[in-house]
A protein has these predicted regions:
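Helix-loop-helix
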Residues: 1-41, 83, 172-175, 186, ...
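Juxtamembrane extramembrane loops of integral membrane proteins
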Residues: 21-103, 146, 150-152, 588-615
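Generic detector of short, locally flexible boundary/turn motifs and exposed helical patches
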Residues: 45-51, 56-60, 136-141, 259-266, ...
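Soluble non-transmembrane domains of integral membrane proteins
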Residues: 71-324
Length: 615
């Protein structure tokens, strides 16, 4: 059988995250929003005003147990970060340059569905930052310090947030003073619990959920990700450098420069239609100096999963080290990752900078890839063509050895024939293997390219999700609630390509081989139907790439067939035959020699078995 089609077929199957008085005078200059209080509220009211009733007066920060939640807004040209006085933590993050399905800013983190809590071990109880109302100080458009202190102001716990200009990175520093006498003597770490119920941002739940996962990097730069499809829970085996709450195109990342320890992660699947993808929880410890001599240095990243952008975050790391955040963008197994990293991304970035529509960019990349593999494709076709013109001679050998017990002799003589004419039966297969890494690399690249998000092309209004040319309200098994036109075109082209391939196969096969291939041929015809149910929910960009790639492949096959002169090819093979026949010292080498040796060995084994059976 022709190995080209089998390899190509298997390929397509694969290819199946109060104010001081001074601040009250500066209120008009600060970016402070208060909810739900009056806008004209004096700034000094922002400080949590405790009431005697219901306040635990034994608490170290008892004067901060009561108050009103207020929000400080930090922003640059890319992101808006809301820091709440309740808990002193980030309560909401908006990305200014990206819109959701409702055409409003993407909200990557919201207090309605997410929380961050830091825990200290007191002498007789745990102190949770989420229980306190912090006082904001040192406020600017891009930074704020949240503080709680005892009634005398001698003991304090602070959290400072600094938003970098033109960046998605937030520097986060935790400091304290005079707190040591009030803590458990064994305290050496600060507890962290981060939760986030990640909202669905894209139109297609299945496709977005498939590329959303809790991911973390352990010491040694080893990135691990939890299951994308199942609820899972695990403990990190090593100290953790960073943890990311990731959906398909955006991530919220917490980076620790002293390494998180005792890290425990949980990812819970959400139901389709709930508006959420997964519920993430990260529970960790980080080294803490109770004496206050050393601060805790952390960073947040709230932004898109864009490979080059994540890679550039290394230069903004607090200690100047490599972060490896680009590992969040899955580019495939090592060989496919290498192709995407050093070829696909470079070409994609270059074409994108030309201002072309993303559909044209994908088309040009596909054409370029086909140009690269044209030479091995042509060699593959010529190898099949040689076998086609020699088919009458192969049929003669089949008639010479019609019995099944002569199958080995028939095969040996056929291989000898190919050898004399200078034809390699594997010539059509091996060159095709060169194409496999490229096709699979593109399969991994396209669904992770945020550049395709909300980019329209032809009838598709968003190449990052399905192009529903027809839709309905009921969610049907296997097909969902829509039909993707690019998926239909891909499957139709797949069928045409399969029929062309089968026709080429029949031209090189004997009658016996053709009979044996009937089941495989029916599978190839039914495969496009299987692909339709499999890829109908996939992104329009991916189906468009498959459609264009197969269409170009079919056109190349048609062109090669039209430009190949069987008569001249046979004359060339006859010349090879005469040259080899007149060269008694000719030696078979390479794959043909190995196949010949294997067949001789098989023949020896069969003859040995016959002798034993006759005894």
């Amino acid at each position: 059988m022709d190995k080209n089609t089998v390899v190509g077929f298997l390929l397509m199957a694969l290819v199946l995250i109060g104010f001081s008085y001074y601040s009250s005078q500066q209120t008009s200059q600060q970016n402070v929003t208060t909810a739900p209080t009056n806008k004209n509220q004096p700034a000094h009211d922002i400080q949590a005003t405790p009431t005697i009733q219901d306040v635990d007066t034994t608490d170290l920060f008892a004067n901060h147990l009561k108050g009103r939640p207020n929000v400080i807004t930090l922003q640059n040209n890319k992101v808006k970060v809301y820091v709440s006085t309740k808990g002193g933590v980030i309560s909401k993050v908006e990305l200014k340059e990206y819109k959701n399905q409702q055409k409003t800013n993407v909200v990557l983190f919201s207090e309605k569905t997410a929380s961050i809590d830091f825990t200290l071990r007191g002498k007789d109880k745990l102190l949770h930052t989420q229980d306190y109302y912090f006082t904001p100080t040192q406020i600017s458009d891009t930074s704020v310090t949240m503080q709680i202190s005892d009634s005398k102001g001698k003991t304090a716990f602070r959290m400072k947030y600094s938003l970098k200009p033109d960046n998605y990175m937030v520097d986060f520093c935790i400091s304290s003073n005079g707190i040591y006498p009030y803590l458990n003597p064994s305290t050496k770490t600060l507890g962290i619990q981060w939760k986030d119920r990640v909202a669905q941002q894209e139109k297609g739940f299945m496709f977005e959920n498939q590329y959303s996962t809790l991911t973390y990097m352990e010491d040694g730069n080893e990135t691990r990700k939890m299951s994308e499809t199942e609820t899972s829970e695990e403990n990190a085996e090593k100290p953790v450098r960073w943890v990311a709450f990731k959906n398909q195109y955006f991530s919220a990342i917490l980076i620790g420069y002293d390494m998180f320890t005792d890290a425990h992660f949980k990812s819970t699947q959400e139901a389709e239609g709930s508006g959420f993808l997964k519920d993430y929880t990260a529970t960790m410890e980080i080294p803490f100096d109770p004496s206050g001599k050393k601060d805790i240095t952390l960073q947040f990243y709230f932004g898109p999963n864009q490979y080059r952008l994540l890679q550039s975050m290394d230069k903004y790391s607090s200690d100047g080290s490599e972060l490896g955040l680009e590992n969040l963008v899955y580019l495939g197994w090592p060989i496919f990752k290498w192709i995407n990293r050093y070829f696909t991304i470079y070409v994609f970035d270059w074409l994108s900078q030309l201002g072309l529509p993303m559909g044209i960019v994908l088309l040009l990349i596909t054409i370029l890839l086909h140009i690269i593999v044209y030479v091995p494709r042509k060699r593959s076709y010529i190898s099949s063509a040689k076998m086609r013109v020699l088919k009458p001679k192969v049929d003669e050998i089949a008639r010479k050895y019609p019995n099944q017990e002569d199958a080995m002799k028939r095969q040996q003589e056929t291989m000898a024939l190919y050898s004399m004419y200078g034809v390699s039966p594997m010539g059509g297969c091996l060159p095709m293997l060169v194409q496999m890494p490229i096709w699979i690399a593109m399969f991994n690249f396209v669904p992770n390219a945020i550049e395709l998000r909300q980019q329209s092309f032809l009838w598709a209004d968003d190449l990052s999700t399905y192009d529903d040319i027809i839709s309905w309200s009921v969610n049907l098994p296997f097909i969902g609630n829509h039909i993707s036109l690019f998926c239909l075109l891909f499957c139709a082209t797949n069928l045409i390509y399969s029929l062309m391939t089968m026709r080429m196969q029949r031209e090189t096969m004997s009658q016996e081989q053709a009979a044996q291939m009937k089941v495989m041929q029916w599978m190839m015809i039914l495969m496009p139907v299987f692909f339709f149910f499999m890829f109908n929910k996939y992104s329009a960009g991916l189906n468009y790439y498959y459609f264009v790639s197969l269409l170009i492949g079919a056109l190349c096959m048609w062109y090669l067939r039209k430009t190949t002169d069987d008569k001249k090819l046979l004359e060339k093979l006859e010349a090879n035959y005469r040259a080899n026949k007149n060269n008694p010292n000719r030696k078979v080498s390479g794959m043909a020699a190995r196949l010949e040796a294997l067949q001789k060995r098989q023949q020896e084994i069969l003859e040995e078995q016959k002798r034993r059976n006759n005894k």
